[in-house]
Structure formats: structure tokens, C-alpha cells
């Protein structure tokens, strides 16, 4: 919860580019920091509004002098594979549910092995402790057995990363699988075929889950990207295998997305972007309960602008969410959260990479033009706000970052977060396009945490219970990190 010392709102967008008065805009919250030029949607520049800038400066000074206590990071109270002793692992058959859903090109070559690499620490830990690893995953959304969704193309890279020859079986249940499991040596790894080749997987049918569980002695879930799904291999198997624990990747996701967000070092800022308010309602409302500063970007800002009575040209607007936008602004104000909307935007005459573009105040978007990125003044204001923080979380681009011309805002935020990370600020990048942005800029490695989840990250930030997590064994006692 934001402190009472931050109860006043930040000045909003001027009615016109030459106005001398501003409407008060309630603070709204953002979840993750964008670091690359904002490519997805544009915002109008604040250059025309000195009052906006002055009000922001006043707010930032108040945050710097705030006496709000700095709090540590608490870990999620789930038992982890690291809590198991060597004796509990040696010689044991361990069913590991990983998320190896990597992209493949037309020739079945892996184009991004991030998820495979993310699964390696847990697998290597089990191998080093003499466990027999039975590795399970899905790939894509097959309708029954579909050769192009086979996990076979993953074997060479997995083997290379693990330093052993991974054995691949043509099914995930049945006599052949049982035979190979029985012959698996300590430290060996057997990769099962795509669990989604069976419709029973996504239906979480108990009999299918029981067959999967019968292969092993204990269960490790390291598939954060599917933890929000109650499937047989993510939730059903836990009813038949004990212990059922979190892998290192899943535990890290929980530590950051639950621990660092619920009990952050302060000031705590959230950056939320993306095209639609409707897709981020839950995240924004949840973050308003926790953050001190909320920075909004992406296409959703135009719904907030219109709700304030501003002209938005042909920019994306969710007409049925105008009242919601107003209520979120009011809620931010009531919670004492400093909500910053872009004061200037980069607009275009069409939605295309070669569109004509210009920078205008957010209050001066002409008819026939659409916002596709935040402007330079907004980037500076956002950066100034971020300079006051100790924890930042970012979810969603600032603009249409698929088009280079409108990626500047997103990329600028990515670079700023990298700079802050080097100064000891906790920086959390939450899935999807935000991850793509920091990777494009080349700063992914310096962030405190980059989430591997898309929908799972959003649901966790919204405060929802993830079936794949709640099903795991509780830790012996809450652990403070």
C-alpha cells in the first residue's frame, strides 16, 4: 500500500497545448518497466505543459523524502527441490514438468532456446544428486498426435546443455515408456513425448495423471509458464506423488513476482503498457494496492486520455472502458499512488512501419492521426520518476515496438532499467513483449529477474491462485530472504 505521504495526484494532461491549467489525474499503477523504444503505441509530448513537469518534480521530491520503510523480499512458502536432501534424491525417479515450449522454424530448428536453458539448473541439480530424471513438457497446441509438435527436435540442444545424451521416448505413458524408465541410470534423463498429444492432459483427467505419476517417486514442477493451468502434468500428478515440490525456476518466479512485489524495497514503481486496458485491468488494480508510482504506456493510454475529455484522433480507444479508466484514476488518487501518463506522444498517419510521424503533446492529437509511441518528454519524466525507486516491475511495451520508428520509448525504458539494475535497484521484467524488448536492446542479462511466464505472470500479479503452484507441498516454514 502506498503511504499517506503520497496522497496527492500528479498533474494530468493539459486541455490544449497552450493551456495554463491542468486536470488532476489520479495515479494509476504499472507493473513492469519498459526499457526499449516504445514501439507499440504512441503518446503525446509534455513539452507544451510546464505545469505538468513542475508538478511531477514536486511529487518526486516528496517520494525521495518519504519515510516509508524499506522492506525485504519474502519467498513463497512452497517446498523447493533445493530443500530435498541428497538421500531423498539419490536413485529416485523424479518426474520433472518443465516448460520446453520453444519456437521452431519450418525446418524444425529451435529459434530461441531460452526456455530450455531456464530448465537446466533444476535438471542438473537432480542429475548431480543421482536422481533419475523423467522430463515432461508440451509444445504448441496439438490436436492429438501431430508430428510437427514432437519434442524430438529438442533432444540435441538438451543433450548439449546437460552434457549427456538425453534419451527420447515416443510416448509419455505406456509399456515402452515404463521399460525405458526402468533402465534409466542414476543421473540419466529421459524425455517423454509431448503430453498434449493426449486430450486428457488439458482436461486434467485423473486416470491420465495417475499413469504419469506411476512412472516416478516424486514430482518437481519447474514449468512456471503453465502453472496457471490445472492440467494433468501440472496439477493432477501432485495427487499421486509426494513430495511434490517447486523447481528452481518456478521458485525464483514466485520469489520475485510474489515476494518482491508484495513486500518490495521502496519506493516501488510499476510500468504497465500494452494495447488494451481490458487486458491489464486485474494487474493495474492489484498493483494499485502495492506500488508508489504507476507509469502507463502503450495503446491503453488513449482510453485514459479520452476519459479525461481529450481528443485522441484515430488512436486505439476502448469506448466501453472509459468509465473504468476514470475509476482507476480515482482509485490511484485515493490510494496515494502517483500515476503518470505520457505527456507527449509520437503519432502516425497510418499503422505501418513507414508511416509519417511527428511528436505532439498528448492534448493535441489531430484527427486522422494515431498515437504509436510515447514521446521524448515522457521518457525523461518517466526516467526521473524511476530514479527515485528501489524496485521496478515492467509489463507491456510503451508503443508499437514491432516498428522501429515507434520503438524508441520502449527501448529507452529498457535501457533505463538496465542502468538502475546496475545501481542496485531490483528490476523485474514480466513476460511477453517486455522480455522481447530487453532482449532486443541487449540488456536482458543485467535485469534482476526476467519472467518466463506470459499468462501465468499476469495472473500471479493480479493476485490469482495458480493451480500448478497451490498443488505443491508447503515449505516447512516461511523463509525470509
UniProtKB/Swiss-Prot annotation:
Chain residues that bind AMP: 276, 280, 299, 371, 402
Binding site for (2R)-3-phosphoglycerate: 98-99, 101, 115, 137-138, 140-141, 196, 228-229
Superkingdom: Eukaryota
CC cofactor: Mg(2+)
PROSITE patterns per the UniProt record, alphabetical: PGLYCERATE_KINASE (PS00111)
InterPro entries hit by this protein: Phosphoglycerate_kinase (IPR001576), Phosphoglycerate_kinase_CS (IPR015911), Phosphoglycerate_kinase_N (IPR015824), Phosphoglycerate_kinase_sf (IPR036043)
Pfam families in alphabetical order: PGK
Chain segment of the transit peptide: 1-75
Positions of CDP binding: 274, 298, 396, 401
Entry similarity comment: Belongs to the phosphoglycerate kinase family.
Quaternary assembly: Monomer.
Annotated protein name in UniProt: Phosphoglycerate kinase, chloroplastic
Lineage: Eukaryota, Viridiplantae, Streptophyta, Embryophyta, Tracheophyta
